[in-house]
Amino acid sequence: MADTSSPSFLQLALARQTVLAGGVIAYPTEAVWGLGCDPWNREAVEYILELKQRPMEKGVILVAASVEQVRFLLDPLPDAVQSEALRHWPGPVTCLLPDVNQQVPEWVRGKHSSIAVRVSDHPVVRALCEATGMPLVSTSCNPAGRQPARAIWQVRRYFGDRIDRIVPGALGGNRKPSRIIDIVTGQQFR
């Protein structure tokens, strides 16, 4: 598989099946390869965290194909906060949104009262979220302390057959992972 290929209909269908069955996928994002799964499946999220050697307390990002997929998080927020988030999407900006009704499980949110959310404009990320019908967990594809994978061979080197499916595609044009902005305070973390 070459990084420049796009996933076929069959590859997307298999990725969908993997995610819905509780598996873990690797896929290209705007800047680096990501690991993803069903955010409502605790075992799948915990497995990703185990692979990465990442503590649950840190939380992970949710990526979505559209604002509608994360509307449940936006609706309880004031109009001004919603507008600020919408100003950044779709695109390579991750917004920290208050999870005021605690709708996102603690294994995704971590120790935080906010949830990191990105409505992506990357075609593979969007296709995966559309195929599964939900936002997905997204975290960089690397063990803690190592550089994120920027090629399929690095994904395989880091995790071998411990990932259920690798979805082919090209990285987006960004050199760095997405910016992270607290949408209420405006503070930028990355």
UniProtKB/Swiss-Prot annotation:
Cellular compartment(s): Cytoplasm
Alphabetical GO biological process terms: regulation of translational fidelity; tRNA threonylcarbamoyladenosine modification
Stored InterPro entries: DHBP_synth_RibB-like_a/b_dom (IPR017945), Sua5-like_dom (IPR006070), TC-AMP_synthase (IPR023535), TC-AMP_synthase_SUA5 (IPR050156)
Top EC class of this enzyme: transferase
One example GO MF annotation: tRNA binding
Keywords: ATP-binding, Cytoplasm, Nucleotide-binding, Nucleotidyltransferase, Transferase, tRNA processing
Domain YrdC-like: 9-190
Catalytic activity: L-threonine + hydrogencarbonate + ATP = L-threonylcarbamoyladenylate + diphosphate + H2O
Task of the protein: Required for the formation of a threonylcarbamoyl group on adenosine at position 37 (t(6)A37) in tRNAs that read codons beginning with adenine. Catalyzes the conversion of L-threonine, HCO(3)(-)/CO(2) and ATP to give threonylcarbamoyl-AMP (TC-AMP) as the acyladenylate intermediate, with the release of diphosphate.
HAMAP family: TsaC
Similarity annotation: Belongs to the SUA5 family. TsaC subfamily.
Name of the featured protein: Threonylcarbamoyl-AMP synthase
Species annotation: Marinobacter nauticus (strain ATCC 700491 / DSM 11845 / VT8)
